[in-house]
């Protein structure tokens, strides 16, 4: 809660532009339209992409603060462009996607329904013998895998070895969780319903249990 405001303070102090990559976090993922709002900061530039069209069409862009835009505008015409700028189909899909997000209350659903329901169940995974930490912001969560819950030590095996085994059990149980090293990541659909969250958590717990047995049987449940 204090990290990003401190980054903002340092950038402001030294006149550094603050640029946020919101390709993943933009358009409701964190329970607000942008993560900048979630973390209480005001960036100069926000980069956006797949959330703008919910991934249905390739599109990207930047949201620029007046402080930056005015400098560029005063410099005259900017002779730069992209081959696929202003693609009409992608632009139309993005506009329709934004309409749906606003009119159907997708961001509010994440903030008021999906996140609170998921949070209690997600953080309960901290009781699993192979989980050292759980985190969840909006509908973006992670669990840190560890062989020692007390110290949250790393595994002795190469980073990602255990995470990969958990991922494989997830795939086998029809749930998508990516592994970044030995940390598991989820980012369910913004429109996920409580009943679907129940299914997600049932499969996540089953996958962790199965992977835990495999890791122990293969002698990998050892701290580095």
Label for each model-derived stretch:
Residues 1-224:
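Conserved N-terminal phosphate-binding loop of PLP-dependent enzymes in the Aspartate aminotransferase
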């Amino acid at each position: 809660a204090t990290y990003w405001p401190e980054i903002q303070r340092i950038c402001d102090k030294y006149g550094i532009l603050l640029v946020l990559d919101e390709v993943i976090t933009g358009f409701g993922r964190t329970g607000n339209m942008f993560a900048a709002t979630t973390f209480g900061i005001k960036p100069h530039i926000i980069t956006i992409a797949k959330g703008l069209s919910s991934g249905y069409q390739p599109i990207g862009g930047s949201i620029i603060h007046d402080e930056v835009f005015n400098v560029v505008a005063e410099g005259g015409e900017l002779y730069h462009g992209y081959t696929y700028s202003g693609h009409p189909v992608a632009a139309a899909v993005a506009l329709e996607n934004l309409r749906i997000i606003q009119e159907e209350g997708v961001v509010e659903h994440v903030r008021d329904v999906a996140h609170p329901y998921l949070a209690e169940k997600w953080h309960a995974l901290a009781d699993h013998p192979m989980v050292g930490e759980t985190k969840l912001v909006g509908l973006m969560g992670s669990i840190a895998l560890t062989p020692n819950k007390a110290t949250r030590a790393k595994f002795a095996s190469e980073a990602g070895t255990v995470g990969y085994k958990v991922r494989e059990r997830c795939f086998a149980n029809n749930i998508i969780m990516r592994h970044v090293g030995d940390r598991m990541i989820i980012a369910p659909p913004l429109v996920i319903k409580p009943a679907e969250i129940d299914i997600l958590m049932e499969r996540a717990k089953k996958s962790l249990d199965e992977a835990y047995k495999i890791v122990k049987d293969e002698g990998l449940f050892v701290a580095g």
